């Protein structure tokens, strides 16, 4: 089963973009343990970002400051998530999203509160999005 984890960064920053990452661990699942990006060092995030790039399916979705102004920060976050999922080179069977809201029009999607602590795919997406934004 192709499970994609989705997380975003940038919700607290009204001036910047919202960055969402979608990661499918596939056969790489279980070879390394991912944690919420807020609980890892910049060096570990960089190392894990590179491992994800080399071993997993991934994509990034961006909602610009104009998107945030046009909609609101939550809708812009959902837009970034949908862009990330749509940009994946494979079609996932299940979408697991960090938080309490599922973007409209997403099939087979489930939100998981504290998902970045509980679900490896979401933790990997958290790492990927934060490193991408910070670098």
Question: PLM features: what roles do these ranges have?
Answer:
Residues 1-135:
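RNase H-like, Mg2+-dependent phosphodiesterase core
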